[in-house]
Amino acid sequence: MRAHDDEFNATVNKIHLNKVKPPKVVVAGIPQGSGRMHGKDWMPDPQDQQTGATELSNEEIARQLELRFGSLQDGIYAKMVEKVGDRLYWENWAREIGLIAQKFIERIARVVKEGLHKEAFVEFLNGLQKNLNPSIDEGQAVEMLAQHMITRPVFDALFKDYQFVKNNAVSRSMQRMLELLESEAMEKDTEVLNKFYENVRMNVGDIDNLEGKQTLIKNLYEKFFKGAFPKTVDKLGIVYTPVECVDFIIHSVDDILRKEFDCSLSDENVHILDPFTGTGTFITRLLQSGLIRPEDLERKYKNEIHCNELVLLAYYIADVNIESVFHSLVKRDTYLPFEGICLTDTFQTTENEENVLDQTWFPENAANVDKQKKAPVRVIMGNPPYSVGQKSANDNAQNLSYAHLDKRIAETYAKAAQATNKNSLYDSYIKAFRWASDRIADCKDGGVVAFISNGAWIDGNAQEGFRKCLEDEYSSIYVLNLRGNQRTSGELSRKEGGKIFGSGSRTPISITLLVKNPAKKGKATIYYHDIGDYLSREQKLKKISEFGSVDSSELQWEIVAPNEKGDWINQRGGIFDSLIILGDKEDKNNKQVVFVPFYSRGLATARDAWCYNSSSESLNANIKRSMDFYNDQRYQLSKGFIKDVEYDLTQISWTTSVLNLALKNQEITQDKIGEKVISLYRPFFKQIGYYSRFWNERVYQLPKLFPTSKYKNLVICVKGIGDKDFSCLIADCIPDLQVIFNGQCFPLYWYEENKNKQQTLSLFDTESSDDYIRRDGITDWILKEVRTRFGNARKITKETIFYYVYGLLHSPKYREAFAADLKKSLPRIPIVEDIDAFLDFSYAGKQLANLHLNYEEIPAYEGVTVIGDRQKEEAPDGRMIAGTTDLYAVKVDYKYYEVEKMRFPKKGQKDTIIYNSSIRIENIPDEAYEYIVNGKSAIEWIMERYQVKTDPSSLIKNDPNDWSREHDNPRYILDLLLSVINVSVQTMEIVKKLPDLKLE
């Protein structure tokens, strides 16, 4: 029936949203006796009642059965939606609306470009720029009109009584512009629009309760936006805040107001602002919370509750949500629009105090913004935008800059920070804290800022200045760390637990309440609580709900005393600073370091799918295709045929540097600007890489370490600054930036260009051995220092020190003692007191280096069993011990050894790996998984990386089996896995025998 009747299909999928069940779907039964049964009309037949039954009146029996049957009906309806309904119904409908929105955008763009009302549209655009942000362009204005066209019929159908389009100030302005444009609409356009409106009425009409309407709007908002306007989502970090978190914040604010200021959210002149309201959840939950006394509700609604939203669709949804909740709570004869909501960019409102808002197209909205700016706001709460900038130029979704706000950050957070890289201080959520802090400072009586936000600031190295300023600017600070950092991996990721925003955000999340009480002087008292390890999202939300407020007796607050470095948690100790720094680029004259200042970050291509591949042939083709497209776009730009490049991710991955090359009309060709090299892309996973100053976004100082593929070197890659656990790995080829998280590479040698080289090239030579001069990466100072400590021991060389560093960095005691320091700075090295211990560390480092560099040549671990159908011809039981000659005698072919994706038989069973449909590896020892590098075991790196993958953006396929084919070794991947198992076991054997490290 659903397949043949769209209206019935919509009815079934609306059942769970409605309280009154649809007449088209009746749940009824037929009794065995003569009684009637149709819904609640069933009455038992006296002849069917057994003798000796409890004496109850027919009316009582009927009442009880009615209750039971009503419960049964609800259960059947729920199952009907689950079993018969389409789980993807609303998601698919949102996707369809997204496609329609794109058609609307194309239609409007055509009309405003060529139509009679072009001048009116320019005035309209000017109004948006004045009300929202000067950066609003024509395309964004067209998008907003399309959003209005989508929103209008949905709200008309859902909220028939509120006449939203007529009552909302911004909606009226949008409708006025659209009516001008619709006068030029073609018949085909009108037909499409009418069909869409009819579809909306069928899908969202007849929902009979406020909760169901809000659920539908929330789902539509999230799914529609992700599908129709992904760049808007990326730019603003649009996510929906769980109500458990919202309620916790609202009740916490009320409790703090009572405790600190002897007032409440309900009191007169306590103005409340949600500067990033989204769909209005904070305001609607505030109205429904019961914290505002009934007699105060209308006053609050009319005068003391304010909110802003930048995205038109979210603004509409917020307004209609707030108005509908208010009218459900306050019974009025007349409709009262909510004038506290503004369509505006919160950050922009304080950029220029003299800025005159648009009075032509958006006069009422402008008046509301002015009214809000004059209000003595005492409470600021909400969910600030999460976005931390576009990932690449392809996104074409740059975050906006705000001169005044950025200046305030520079004067405060950045000035107080010691970190070199301060870019993250300009992330949107940090800007929100700065803006709110300045806004609340305007209220002489003090106030509260309460945000749920990205929680990376709590322990981030770059946010040290931010933390120091919070401590100085507020009297009390409450931080509930909800964790959930899914930019980690392995055990650390599991400890972080579920993501509060589900798939909406991978960052850690925190709830922060900042209290500014003028009566309290000195630095803030900091209250901190960690939600706990290994909790799912549902468990976290349950705990937050149980807490209810910061004043809950269930919440055990820890008083934090920051150290001099600005650490609140995971505080660094004092010993680390007394150790010898690996390298110092800030002070290149500092000689008391281990390495010269030519260490480098790993290769950052910003277009990995294009610049790396398992196949040399595929890499050639990919590079050629992207460069051909680049040169075509460059040429068209230079001739004025196009104004901007085409952002087609299947042709090229644009970055800032490559865009600049195109703007300069610089032609590039594959052979002239780079070369193919072997690169270590991830631990124990080599790729063919394209190495180029032009086509790689950042090569850093790698050309000094690996000038070309001809020059050999060893580098120790250590984890860069960040919240991942420390690890390191040695490499003898160009390492990717993420072979170790944000890796810094410390070299045994570096190469200096020989400017006085002799020109002795023959006709067939391409490069002279005199092009570069090899220099030592280890400093003369550290060599002298170590030798002096050990009685001028001449047997200690720079190479000895290099391997000492590698051995020491594997010491479990070193990693444990300095875990907090290693997240916030590069390693520092102690020199052990005893020469024998020093040499033992160095020898162990050399052993580890041999394993980690020559891992492909290490034989399989004895005892690991390989099972495969082919081996049955060689052994009756189908089993052969890895490493025996019989295994290699088996006739091979590439198809047999191909891998699609390796896996474990089931979760938690790691002694066996299913290699492919024919081959299985068993008896893998537990200790093989103890070797963790860059967040996961070496074995699991092989399993993750050696699988056939297609990049979702470029659609480039990377097949690791191509490496086997091009290296004439069909067994390469299988042998590699067997080798890495042994490498892992041997690594841990060496690590466990390292000398004891005394760190007094």
State where each predicted segment sits.
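Active-site-adjacent bridging/hinge elements
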Residues: 117-131, 216-231, 290-298, 352-356, ...
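Extended, hydrophobic alpha-helical segments in both membrane/secreted and soluble proteins
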Residues: 232, 241-257, 271-286, 314, ...
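Sequence-level detector for compositionally biased, low-complexity segments
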Residues: 394, 419, 435-1000
